[in-house]
C-alpha cells in the first residue's frame, strides 16, 4: 500500500476499490487465493512498481486496483470482460490498466531475470548444507532446461509451433539457481525447435545469456550434450528418481551419479512446477492472446515468481514444491529414451566450431561433447560411490 494515510479516503471508488480493500485488509488467505500472494507481498509489489518502474495511478484507478486486476488475470486466468464486471470498470479502462501494469512488470523482468551480483562466486546454502550434494557438486551454479507452454501460433508459421504431440506450443528455455529463482529465460521459440538448438542460439547470440564462469557449470538433462560448463547424466542409464523407486537402488557407479544428479537437477523441474501452479493462465490449452502479447505475459509471470520468492520465503506454493524432490515434468520415460537417442545422433553430426574468447572469462557454448566434463562426471561418480553400498 503506497500511502496508508489515504486509506480512509479511498472508500468512494466503487465496487472495484471495495474489492481491493477487502483483499488488502481482510483475510490474508483470501488475498493469497485470489492474487496468488499474501497481503504484505502484494503491497510491496505495488510500491516497487510505482517507485522503481514508473507505474502511476490515475484519478479513477489507484495502483493497487490496477495491479490486483492484472494478478487476477494471470493468477486466475480471468478474461478482461470478467475483470471489468468484477471491478465495475469499462473494458477500455481495464485493458489500459492491464497494459500499464504489464509494461512496468516487463521493465522489472529485465532486472529480475538475471543472476544477482556475485551470484556465481558464493555458494547457495541449499547446496552447501546438504551432504548429498556437498562437496561433490561444489562448482555447480544452477540447472538449465526447456519447458513447453501452449500458444496461439501465427497463421503464417503455425506448423513450426507443433511439437511431438501436435499441439501448438512455444519452448521456454530457463536457468534457475538452487533458490528456485529464474536467472535467465528465453521465451517464444516455436515448439518444434530442438532443445540443444535453442540453447546454442541463446548462448551464441543473446548478449545477456549468463555463461558459466570458468570452473563452474550448470546441470542439464540428457537432452543436452555434456560439454564445458554443462554437466549432463550418463545416457542409457537409469536417471529419473521414479525409475529407481520402481526398479530398486543404484547398482553401479554410473547409476549412483545419475540418481544424485537427477535429485539435484530436479530444482529446475520444481521451479517450473511452482511457476505453472501459481499462474493459472499458463495452464490454458488454447491461449486467447496473440503471440507477442503472450510472450510478454509469460515473461511477466516469471518476474513475479522471482519477486514472491524474494519477498516471502514461506510462500505456501514454494514450500510445497521445495519438498517435491521426485517431481519431474517428462513423465514418459520411453519417449525420453527415444529423445536421448536422437540427441546422440545430432551430436555426432554436429561439427565443432571455434567461437573465440569474447565472453570475459566465461565459457562460450559449443554443442559438442567435452572430455574434461566427462572426466569430472566420472570423478564425482567415484566419490559418491565410496559412501554408497553397491552390490559388488
Regions found by a protein language model. Give the residues of each.
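Charged, often Cys/His-bearing segments associated with DNA-binding zinc-finger transcription factors
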Residues: 1-56, 110-115, 350-392
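Short, amphipathic alpha-helical "recognition" segments used to contact nucleic acids or chromatin
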Residues: 64-76
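Short alpha-helical segments in extracytoplasmic peptidoglycan/chitin-binding modules
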Residues: 38, 69, 83
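Generic alpha-helical secondary structure signal
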Residues: 40-44, 68, 270, 274
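Short acidic-aromatic active-site loops that bind/stabilize oxyanions
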Residues: 31-35, 59, 257, 261, ...
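Structural recognition of short helix-loop-helix hairpins that underlie histone-fold modules
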Residues: 43-61, 77-78, 276-286
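Short, well-ordered secondary-structure "scaffold" segments embedded in the functional core
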Residues: 79-392
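Short coil/turn segments at secondary-structure boundaries
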Residues: 33-36, 57-61, 85, 89
Amino acid at each position: 500500500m503506497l500511502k496508508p494515510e489515504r486509506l480512509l479516503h479511498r472508500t468512494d471508488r466503487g465496487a472495484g476499490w471495495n474489492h481491493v480493500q477487502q483483499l488488502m485488509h481482510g483475510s490474508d488467505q483470501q488475498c493469497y487465493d485470489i492474487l496468488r500472494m499474501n497481503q504484505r507481498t502484494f503491497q510491496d509489489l505495488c510500491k516497487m512498481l510505482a517507485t522503481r518502474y514508473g507505474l502511476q495511478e490515475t484519478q479513477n484507478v489507484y495502483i493497487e486496483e490496477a495491479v490486483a486486476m492484472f494478478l487476477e488475470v494471470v493468477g486466475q486466468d480471468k478474461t478482461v470482460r470478467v475483470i471489468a464486471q468484477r471491478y465495475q470498470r469499462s473494458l477500455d479502462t481495464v485493458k489500459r490498466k492491464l497494459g500499464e501494469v504489464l509494461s512496468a512488470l516487463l521493465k522489472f523482468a529485465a532486472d529480475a531475470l538475471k543472476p544477482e551480483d556475485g551470484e556465481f562466486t558464493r555458494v547457495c546454502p541449499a547446496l552447501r548444507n546438504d551432504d548429498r550434494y556437498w562437496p561433490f557438486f561444489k562448482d555447480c551454479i544452477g540447472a538449465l532446461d526447456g519447458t513447453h507452454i501452449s500458444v496461439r501460433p501465427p497463421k503464417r508459421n503455425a506448423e513450426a509451433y507443433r511439437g511431438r504431440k501436435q499441439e501448438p506450443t512455444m519452448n521456454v528455455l530457463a536457468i534457475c539457481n538452487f533458490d528456485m529463482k529464474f536467472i535467465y529465460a528465453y521465451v517464444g521459440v516455436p515448439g518444434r525447435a530442438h532443445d540443444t538448438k535453442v540453447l546454442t542460439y541463446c548462448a551464441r547470440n543473446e548478449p545477456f545469456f549468463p555463461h558459466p564462469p570458468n570452473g563452474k557449470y550448470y546441470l542439464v538433462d540428457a537432452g543436452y550434450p555434456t560439454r564445458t560448463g554443462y554437466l549432463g547424466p550418463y545416457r542409457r542409464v537409469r536417471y529419473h528418481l521414479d525409475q529407481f523407486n520402481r526398479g530398486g537402488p543404484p547398482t553401479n557407479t554410473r547409476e549412483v551419479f545419475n540418481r544424485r544428479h537427477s535429485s539435484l537437477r530436479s530444482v529446475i523441474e520444481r521451479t517450473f512446477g511452482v511457476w505453472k501452479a501459481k499462474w493459472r493462465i499458463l495452464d490454458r490449452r488454447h491461449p486467447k492472446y496473440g503471440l507477442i502479447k503472450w510472450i510478454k505475459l509469460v515473461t511477466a509471470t516469471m518476474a513475479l515468481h522471482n519477486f514472491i520468492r524474494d519477498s516471502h520465503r514461506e510462500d505456501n506454493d514454494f514450500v510445497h514444491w521445495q519438498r517435491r524432490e521426485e517431481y519431474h515434468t517428462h513423465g514418459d520415460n520411453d519417449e525420453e529414451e527415444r529423445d536421448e537417442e536422437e540427441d546422440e545422433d545430432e551430436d555426432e553430426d554436429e561439427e565443432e566450431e571455434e567461437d573465440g574468447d569474447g565472453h570475459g572469462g566465461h565459457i562460450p557454448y559449443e554443442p559438442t561433447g567435452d572430455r574434461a566434463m566427462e572426466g569430472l562426471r566420472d570423478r564425482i561418480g567415484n566419490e559418491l560411490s565410496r559412501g554408497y553400498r553397491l552390490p559388488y
